Structure formats: C-alpha cells, structure tokens
UniProtKB/Swiss-Prot annotation:
Record PTM: Acetylated at Lys-131 by EP300; increases interaction with EP300 and stimulates ALX1 transcriptional activity.
Lineage: Eukaryota, Metazoa, Chordata, Craniata, Vertebrata
Protein name per Swiss-Prot or TrEMBL: ALX homeobox protein 1
Organism field: Mus musculus
GO molecular function, one term: RNA polymerase II transcription regulatory region sequence-specific DNA binding
Disrupted-gene phenotype: Mice lacking Alx1 die within 24 hours of birth. The overt phenotype is acrania and degeneration of unprotected brain tissues. This is most probably the cause of the death since no other abnormality in limbs and visceral tissues is observed. The defect in cranial bone formation may be a consequence of extensive loss of forebrain head mesenchyme due to cell death and neural tube closure defects earlier during development. The penetrance of the acrania/meroanencephaly phenotype is variable between mice strains. Heterozygous mice appear normal and fertile.
Length: 326
C-alpha cells in the first residue's frame, strides 16, 4: 500500500469490493476508512466524496457535484482495477503495452512507407520513360553508298535533298540529317590531321639537320694537315691564330686568296708557262694554308682544280699566238 500511494497517485471511482482507491491530498488508509460501510450511490455520499477530493466553500456545489461527480458516474475509470487471481504488475504492464501500441500505430488515412516508396518508384519510371531514348542505326552498304554520293556533291544538303535521299535509302529524314552531321565532323577531323602531317613533313624537309658530320671530309682534312707540316715545318694555319679568328667562323670566305692567286697568275703568264701542273697544285695548297682556311671540302677542291686547268690551257694558247705573231 505504501508503495502504491507514493509512486502511483491515481484516481478511481469508489466501487464496492474495490481495494484500491487513492485521492489527492490524503493517504490510502484515510480514504478507505471514510468509504467503509457506505452506499456509493446517492446524495448522502456526495459529501464524503467531496471530502476525499477536497472541501468546497458553498453548499450548492454539492448539488452540482452530485450531478457531475465521478462518484456518481460508474462509466468513467481513471485508474487500474485489480482483477482477482492476477497480480497488479501484470495489469500495469498491460496498460503500458496499450499505450505503446497506441503510439506506434499509424494514423488512419496516411499511406505507409512502403506505399510511398512505390509511388516514388512509379514517378521515377514515368520520368525515365518520358526521356527520349537514343537508338543506334545500322546502315547497310547500299545506304552508305547513296549517302556518300550525296556527300561528295555537297556537305550541307537541304531539306528537299535529304527527303529524297531518305526515300531512296528507306530511312527517316532525321536519320539522314544526323548521318550528315557525323560525316562532316569526321571529315573535319581528317582534314585537320592531314594538315598537321603536311606541316610536319614540310618542316622536316626544310630544316633537315644531320647530327653526325660527313665522313668524306676526314681524309681531305688529314691530307691538308700533313701537306702543311711537310712543306713549312713551322707553318701555322689561320685558325690557330687568335687575331684572324674570323676566317674560322666563315669556312667559305676564300675570296682574298683566290683573287690574289688569279691576279698573280694573269700577270706572270710567261713565268708559269714552264712550271709543271703538279708543282702548281702544291704551291696553291701552300698558299691556301698560309693565307686562308686550310680545311677544304672535296667539291670546292675539285672546282678550283678544274678552273685552274682551264686557265692553264688558255695561257698556253695565248703564248702560242704571241710566238706565231712574232
């Protein structure tokens, strides 16, 4: 009893053979004593019920309480009635289970979560079905041939040409238009790639720079060096002198040497008329070693030797003409 009065301060109507009745502001034993051996239905018991719930200042409230008091209404139940043969804790647990069931039960009229998910899936399916699907068209060889013929004539056919082509190829005008768009993109890509390759080939042909030097120049360089060492002993080429380094930077600047040799040759034609050709070649090599660049390439040497031979023949003819005139 003490446990119930302290922990569970509940209200219940006074009923016969009821062991549990608790009111506000009083202990359970006091309430039970005031309700013993009394009939709980009538005006006489109204005062005791009011005393259990609290005193009222005026008498007319007793009449009103007689009509609306929970003591007179047996249908209202604010507490837990003990059933014979069952302990109290089972009743309390049952009441708590009922409250939990009421809280967890869904509200009527509201769709459940599974139904909402189904509605969402249906909406997604409707949206996806409303989207335009893309289908890949497989063209036959005859269709491609007809399309390529028109593409060779014009890259941008008008609507009339596309409709006529669609009738011949048994395609729709939209398919023909899409094919021409893709074909133009492919053609532009090929043209761009061809221009890049052409530019690369032109650059390679214009600026063809070989990394390794030519091998045919090595024997001529060695021969010129040996000839210079054998003739003078202390002859130093112009490339080794610091004051004449400009001649090393221009390997083909032989104009002063050639002009002086040609001038000396024309002035002294009679003097060189009896000199053998081999001695003249040796002198020209020595002159080139002292005045200009000693490293001669093979084509330059051949050109000079042929021009010297022609001048030698002209000198002989001139000498013969002079002697014949005398």
């Amino acid at each position: 009893m003490e446990f119930l009065s302290e922990k569970f301060a509940l209200k219940s109507p006074p009923s016969k053979n009821s062991d549990f009745y608790m009111g506000t502001g009083g202990a359970l034993e006091h309430v039970m004593e005031t309700l013993d051996n009394e009939s709980f239905y009538g005006k006489a018991t109204a005062g005791k019920c009011v005393q259990a719930f609290g005193p009222l200042p005026r008498a007319e409230h007793h009449v009103r309480l007689d009509r609306t008091s929970p003591c007179q209404d047996s249908s209202v139940n604010y507490g837990i009635t003990k059933v014979e043969g069952q302990p109290l804790h089972t009743e309390l647990n049952r009441a708590m289970d009922n409250c939990n069931n009421l809280r967890m039960s869904p509200v009527k009229g509201m769709p459940e979560k599974s139904e909402l998910d189904e509605l969402g899936d249906k909406c997604d399916s409707n949206v996806s079905s409303s989207k335009k699907r893309r289908h890949r068209t497989t063209f036959t060889s005859l269709q491609l041939e007809e399309l390529e013929k028109v593409f060779q004539k014009t890259h941008y056919p008008d609507v009339y040409v596309r409709e006529q082509l669609a009738l011949r190829t048994e395609l729709t005008e939209a398919r023909v238009q899409v094919w021409f768009q893709n074909r133009r993109a492919k053609w532009r890509k090929r043209e761009r790639y061809g221009q890049i390759q052409q530019a690369k080939s032109h650059f390679a042909a214009t600026y063809d720079i070989s990394v390794l030097p030519r091998t045919d120049s090595y024997p001529q360089i060695q021969n010129n060096l040996w000839a210079g060492n054998a003739s003078g002993g202390s002859v130093v080429t112009s490339c080794m002198l610091p004051r004449d380094a400009s001649s090393c930077m221009t390997p083909y600047s032989h104009s002063p040497r050639t002009d002086s040799s040609y001038t000396g040759f024309s002035n002294h034609q009679n003097q060189f008329s009896h000199v053998p050709l081999n001695n003249f070649f040796t002198d020209s090599l020595l002159t080139g070693a002292t005045n200009g660049h000693a490293f001669e390439t093979k084509p330059e040497f051949e050109r000079r030797s042929s021009s010297i031979a022609v001048l030698r023949m002209k000198a002989k003819e001139h000498t013969a003409n002079i002697s014949w005139a005398m």
